[in-house]
């Protein structure tokens, strides 16, 4: 499911794509809700029996059956740990004119609740995640982004869960951006599911893997498979420094390219002008007037 907002502040050539769990927030949002509401034992008991996305839908039913309300889930989400420099980093990237998107294997309900609480929901032009909604009984329903019960997604990377291939989402984003003109992408993530989209990035793009997390380990096995420039980060503070530094670097390079193009065009115009001035022209004289002879 993709959510689109009217965030149209992007006035540069950069799209920043964030993972959510352990990237924007410091923990896994699914585990946080389950643990904080006291359902860890049941979760661990059921985990070997079904896919993660299916299990989360089952756990939301269990929460409802045990009397847990949607408001209680929201309250837990509002206390989720986040590094104090992450929100300023996101705001700075937006203020610098970047288009911001989220691609996450969490769910829409969790993400929207958290970004709204943080006051940054309007900064993202699109959120791609597993659908999450409250049904008529007051139960939070979570379904897969890709319905793997009907058909598998076409990814053969081997690191993507059955319900979501982030690489396919990035390819769709790239296709839409191509219609708008050339754009550079910065992708931030931490998990194994962030490896496939990292492989899809182009040479002018940047990938920011969280160091010593699964995506970093996968990239480190063979960095030559990654066409994009690799800029690792460790926590919210280093994320802010590296992200904003990369944005400024891209903007500086684009300004240099514009100045160079402008200078080349000026040189061409001067050459044309000089060439015209050096062409020999015969003087153009006015036609003589006939003067009548008076007798």
Curated annotation (Swiss-Prot):
It catalyses: diphosphate + H2O = 2 phosphate + H(+). The keyword Hydrolase applies. Its cofactor is Mg(2+); Fe(2+); Ni(2+); Co(2+). GO terms for molecular function: inorganic diphosphate phosphatase activity; metal ion binding; phosphatase activity; pyrophosphatase activity. Magnesium. Can also use iron, nickel, cobalt and manganese, but not zinc ions. Substrate binds at residues 30, 105. InterPro entries: HAD-like_sf (IPR036412), HAD_hydro_PyrdxlP_Pase-like (IPR006384), HAD_sf (IPR023214), Pase_PHOSPHO-typ (IPR016965). Its EC number is 3.6.1.1. The active site is at 19 (nucleophile), 21 (proton donor). Belongs to the HAD-like hydrolase superfamily. Tetramer. This is Inorganic pyrophosphatase 1.
């Amino acid at each position: 499911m993709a959510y689109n907002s009217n965030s149209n502040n992007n006035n540069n050539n950069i799209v920043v794509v964030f993972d959510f769990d352990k990237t924007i927030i410091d923990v896994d949002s699914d585990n946080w809700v389950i643990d904080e509401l006291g359902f860890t034992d049941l979760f661990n008991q059921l985990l070997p029996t079904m896919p993660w996305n299916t299990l989360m839908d089952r756990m939301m039913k269990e929460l409802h059956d045990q009397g847990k309300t949607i408001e209680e889930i929201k309250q837990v989400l509002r206390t989720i740990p986040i590094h104090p420099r992450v929100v300023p980093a996101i705001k700075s990237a937006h203020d610098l004119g970047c288009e911001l998107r989220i691609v996450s294997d969490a769910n829409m309900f969790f993400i929207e609740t958290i970004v709204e609480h943080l006051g940054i929901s309007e900064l993202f032009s699109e959120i791609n995640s597993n659908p999450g909604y409250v049904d008529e009984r007051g139960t939070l329903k979570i379904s897969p982004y890709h319905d793997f019960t009907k058909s598998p997604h076409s990814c053969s990377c081997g690191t993507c869960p059955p319900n979501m291939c982030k690489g396919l989402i990035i390819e769709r984003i790239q296709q839409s951006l191509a219609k708008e003109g050339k754009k550079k992408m910065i992708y931030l993530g931490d998990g194994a599911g962030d490896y496939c989209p990292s492989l899809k990035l182009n040479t002018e793009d940047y990938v920011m893997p969280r160091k010593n997390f699964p995506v970093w380990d996968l990239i480190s096995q063979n960095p030559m498979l990654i066409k994009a420039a690799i800029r690792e980060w460790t926590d919210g503070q280093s994320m802010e420094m590296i992200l904003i530094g990369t944005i400024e670097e891209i903007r500086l390079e684009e300004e240099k390219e514009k100045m160079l193009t402008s200078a080349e065009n000026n040189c061409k115009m001067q050459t044309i002008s000089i060439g015209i001035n050096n062409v020999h022209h015969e003087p153009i004289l006015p036609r003589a007037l006939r003067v009548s002879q008076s007798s």
